[in-house]
UniProtKB/Swiss-Prot annotation:
Primary location recorded for the protein, binned into one broad class: cytoplasm
EC top class, as a word: transferase
Active site, UniProt feature: K83
Domain of life, source organism: Bacteria
The entry's keywords: Cytoplasm, Pentose shunt, Schiff base, Transferase
Protein name: Probable transaldolase
Gene encoding the protein: tal
GO molecular function: aldehyde-lyase activity; transaldolase activity
Catalytic activity: D-sedoheptulose 7-phosphate + D-glyceraldehyde 3-phosphate = D-erythrose 4-phosphate + beta-D-fructose 6-phosphate
Species name: Anaeromyxobacter dehalogenans (strain 2CP-1 / ATCC BAA-258)
GO cellular component, one term: cytoplasm
Length: 217
């Protein structure tokens, strides 16, 4: 399973790259707003850092506007993937952009049927939002399981990109279900490496090491 980092913070991207845990990047307007920077400046910098897929989200909600923004962002680098919402207008844009050779990530997916439509339209990625479904007492990972099964049933090439990841269990379940990608906040990436028994074991090893006779310097 590929790890994308869900951020527009260049510092976090650099840290994930140093760990070998950044196969790609996903951004959205909310993440960009947190940086206090203009999106195009951020996108240009990320393109210079990351060789893998970089999702750049359109803010237009109409077909023509999505095409205009998508075509513009696609010029920033061959690794740029245009991110569009799962609406009827968005699906129209997916079909057109895909036919033009542009990769598309369909976002804000909350049902397997929506994911089926995105695959039929030719999406490169589908982004089911598991955390937001969990927030309303629905099962986000059950949605992912259904999407993976549907895509396997019919041989769709659209990759399942699990989004709205809130904690390590989401990453674990995505991997068990066979999702192609999980896009993960840097804070969750750090949590993945932590375990209380690892900390306890390291503490004991270091304490025991202090008891070992040392050669004089």
């Amino acid at each position: 399973m590929k790890f994308f980092i869900d951020t527009a913070d260049v510092g976090e991207i650099k840290k994930a790259l140093a760990l070998g845990l950044c196969d790609g990047v996903t951004t959205n307007p909310s993440l960009v707003a947190k940086t206090g920077r203009g999106f195009e400046d951020v996108l240009k910098e990320i393109v210079q850092l990351v060789p893998g897929p970089i999702s750049a989200e359109v803010t237009a909600t109409d077909y023509e506007g999505m095409l205009r923004e998508g075509r513009h962002y696609a010029k920033f680098g061959s690794q740029v993937v245009i991110k569009v919402p799962l609406t009827v207008e968005g699906l129209r844009a997916v079909k057109t952009l895909t036919d033009e050779g542009t990769k598309v990530n369909v976002t804000l997916c909350f049902s397997p049927v929506q994911a089926l439509l995105a695959a039929k339209a030719g999406a490169t990625y589908i982004s089911p939002f598991v955390g937001r479904l969990d927030d309303i007492s629905q099962d986000g990972m059950a949605m992912v399981a259904d999407i993976v099964q549907i895509y396997r049933n019919y041989g769709f090439k659209t990759q399942v990109l699990v989004a709205s990841v809130r904690h390590p269990v989401h990453v674990l379940e995505a991997a068990k279900l066979g999702a192609d990608v999980a896009t993960i906040p840097y804070s969750v990436i750090e949590q993945l490496a932590k375990h209380p028994l690892t900390d306890a074991g390291l503490k004991k090893f270091l304490a025991d090491w202090e008891k070992v006779p040392k050669a004089p310097k």
